[in-house]
Amino acid sequence: MADFTRIPLWLIGTIVGILVIGLIGIYFYGSYSGLGSSL
């Protein structure tokens, strides 16, 4: 990983939050659409 001292913590938190919400959303959407079983 790069030097985290140059990256604001709020930026890291925002990116991680978006990724987590996106993964959860895709997971539930896939399960709702019947594609979750293939994952």
UniProtKB/Swiss-Prot annotation:
Presence of keyword Lipid biosynthesis:
no
Q: Name one GO cellular component term.
A: photosystem II reaction center
Domain of life, per the record?
Eukaryota
Q: Which SUPFAM superfamilies match?
A: Photosystem II reaction center protein J, PsbJ
Location relative to the cell: Plastid, Chloroplast thylakoid membrane
One BP annotation, GO: photosynthesis
Which keywords describe this protein according to UniProt?
A: Chloroplast, Membrane, Photosynthesis, Photosystem II, Plastid, Reaction center, Thylakoid, Transmembrane, Transmembrane helix
The way this protein sits in the membrane is described as: Single-pass membrane protein
**Where, by residue number, does the polypeptide cross the bilayer?**
7-27
In which family does this protein belong, per the annotation? Answer: Belongs to the PsbJ family.
Report quaternary structure and partners: PSII is composed of 1 copy each of membrane proteins PsbA, PsbB, PsbC, PsbD, PsbE, PsbF, PsbH, PsbI, PsbJ, PsbK, PsbL, PsbM, PsbT, PsbX, PsbY, PsbZ, Psb30/Ycf12, at least 3 peripheral proteins of the oxygen-evolving complex and a large number of cofactors. It forms dimeric complexes.
Q: What does this protein do?
A: One of the components of the core complex of photosystem II (PSII). PSII is a light-driven water:plastoquinone oxidoreductase that uses light energy to abstract electrons from H(2)O, generating O(2) and a proton gradient subsequently used for ATP formation. It consists of a core antenna complex that captures photons, and an electron transfer chain that converts photonic excitation into a charge separation.
Q: Indicate what this protein is called per its UniProt record.
A: Photosystem II reaction center protein J
Its gene is psbJ
